[in-house]
């Protein structure tokens, strides 16, 4: 527990018994095109499938709850990369120096959004009648890393080892990974709203809905940006004649006095039903990063806890989770072999 919350607990002895600590950790990594291991090594590897998404997200939160109120410290990282299938294919071919398809015209489209931020979250929860329960949380965030923008254009194959392109670029950043521009890091401040809702249809059926970043903006001061046309006029060739391109920019490099980075909502819903005895079923749904994800599973009550397994069809992944009293854990993966892993989720919570 951070020192602030420990000091708060000790300074309020009359309320200490009612203060309930909690910890939440969630992590997701997903790549549609190449294994996560290869994605971290600039896509170098033999495995490739056509796809349009990669993302990584991590959320750590710890704090205290007192009756209907709560306060916590949040630290988060989000990286969302979307691209056309043509973009993925060209990037993988060139990264591995594989033969390029003669006469091919690639439609290049990339959209990137990333933040690193931390801050304080205040939440309020209450019941709605006998069957419903809701929670609203507002987080004040200080951010110190950003990527926000995109690339569009076309690339034409000249021969099996060479190609050229004209690309329109418009993006804000903390580090210029495209042109190695040296800049001072911008500072960002903002907010994010988290909402949760639970409804008990009957003794055996329950609905849980959570929305992170229901409304979420980061306001960046003195934010570096690049806007213009990138061409392939500067080329180098290796000993085998395969091209390596250092883009040439014709356009603007500047500093925005203020820019707004908007974060998209991420939805999660779970509908669970208990059948006769210790058995049950559940249906799960996620909407995030322009993807609809569906999971279907079964539950088994064990003592005071519950074990469940779910199959997520889009990722072809299996989830195993365990909950007992205030403690919960789950892991989701599409492969057991680390070198082939394309989707992995981890979740750990106490007092959630």
Language-model segments: residues:
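Membrane-embedded beta-strand positions of outer-membrane beta-barrel proteins
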Residues: 21-25, 71-73, 134-138, 195, ...
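Outer membrane beta-barrel transmembrane domains
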Residues: 221-352
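Loop-centered beta-sheet repeat module
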Residues: 153-226
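Short solvent-exposed loop/turn micro-motifs enriched in small/polar/acidic residues
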Residues: 55-57, 115-117, 190, 199, ...
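Gram-negative bacterial Sec-dependent N-terminal signal peptides
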Residues: 1-18
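Residues on the lipid-exposed face of transmembrane beta-strands in outer-membrane beta-barrel proteins
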Residues: 58-66, 118-126, 193-199, 209, ...
């Amino acid at each position: 527990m951070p020192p602030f919350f420990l000091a708060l607990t000790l300074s309020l002895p009359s309320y200490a018994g009612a203060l309930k600590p909690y910890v939440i950790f969630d992590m997701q990594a997903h790549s549609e095109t190449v294994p996560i291991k290869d994605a971290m090594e600039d896509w170098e590897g033999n495995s490739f499938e056509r796809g349009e998404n990669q993302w990584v997200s991590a959320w750590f939160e710890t704090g205290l709850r007192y009756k209907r109120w709560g306060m916590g410290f949040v630290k988060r990282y989000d990286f969302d990369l979307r691209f056309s299938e043509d973009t993925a294919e060209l990037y993988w071919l060139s990264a591995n120096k594989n033969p390029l398809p003669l006469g091919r015209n690639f439609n290049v489209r990339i959209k990137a959004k990333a933040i690193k931020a931390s801050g304080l979250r205040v939440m309020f929860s209450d019941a709605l009648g006998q069957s419903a329960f809701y929670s609203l949380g507002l987080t004040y965030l200080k951010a110190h890393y950003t990527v926000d923008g995109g690339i569009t254009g076309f690339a034409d194959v000249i021969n099996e080892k060479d190609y050229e392109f004209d690309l329109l670029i418009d993006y804000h950043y903390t580090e210029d990974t495209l042109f190695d521009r040296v800049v001072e890091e911008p500072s960002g401040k903002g907010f994010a709203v988290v909402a949760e809702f639970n409804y008990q249809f009957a003794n055996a059926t329950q609905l849980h809905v959570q929305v992170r970043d229901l409304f979420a903006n980061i306001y960046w001061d003195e934010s570096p940006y690049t806007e213009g046309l990138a061409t392939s006029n500067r080329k180098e060739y290796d000993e085998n004649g395969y091209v390596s391109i250092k883009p040439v920019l014709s356009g603007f490099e500047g500093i925005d006095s203020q820019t707004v980075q908007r974060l998209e909502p991420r939805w999660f819903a779970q509908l669970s039903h208990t059948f006769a005895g210790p058995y049950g079923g559940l249906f799960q749904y996620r909407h995030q990063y322009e993807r609809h994800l569906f999971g279907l599973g079964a539950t088994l009550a064990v003592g005071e806890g519950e074990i469940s397994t779910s199959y997520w069809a889009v990722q072809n992944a299996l989830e195993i989770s365990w909950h007992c009293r205030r403690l919960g854990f789950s892991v989701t993966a599409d492969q057991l072999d680390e070198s082939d892993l394309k989707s992995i989720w981890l979740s750990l919570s106490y007092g959630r």
